[in-house]
């Protein structure tokens, strides 16, 4: 069962990512140690898509290095 969008957002915010806004249901998360923007789209209660989970996993790995 896929995780929810709100869970991905919580994981990003827990390690220091900051939501820098976006349009509609899109959110842009930035972190000083991550060289790219992590974009999450969808309503918080929606299921996360596989590419979104992959992007978050990669960003968390990048920050932990």
How should each PLM-predicted stretch be described?
Residues 2-21, 30-65:
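Basic nucleic-acid-binding interfaces
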């Amino acid at each position: 069962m896929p995780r929810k969008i709100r869970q991905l957002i919580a994981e990003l915010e827990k390690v220091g990512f900051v939501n820098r806004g976006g349009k509609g249901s899109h959110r842009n998360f930035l972190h000083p140690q991550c060289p790219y923007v992590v974009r999450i789209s969808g309503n918080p209660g929606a299921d996360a898509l596989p590419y979104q989970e992959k992007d978050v996993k990669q960003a968390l790995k990048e920050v932990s290095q």
